[in-house]
Amino acid sequence: DWTGEFVREHTRQKLAFGSVSLLPPYATHRETAVLCLNPVHAKPFVDFYYAFHEKYESFCKGIGSFSAVSEDKPVIHCTLSVVRITELQDALELVFQNDVFTQAEVTALEIYTYPMRLIKRFDLTRA
């Protein structure tokens, strides 16, 4: 399987979360926005992201323009929550009250069904 092969060829990725963002309301979801943390775009992490998504998108279509590298404009992000627009102030206050702008490490890739049920975990090796 291609995910296992990808993991064997790549190592864990260090990253830092440097900002918060919102993905705008769209289609039938006009009353909500997606609240995200954004990693700093360090080249090793961006290269890892693109390498994974190029392979992933050859198998899975319709992942959305905010994640797709095939459209060459992904918004690299970590989703925190889907928030009602009227509750954004409270959500942002919660984010800023916690230590979310920190270092992190991608240690594995996981495949899920929707709703969130783990199918398989692929651990990345240390660099």
Language-model regions, residue ranges each:
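Histidine-dependent nucleotide/RNA phosphoesterase domain, centered on the 2H-phosphoesterase fold
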Residues: D1-A127
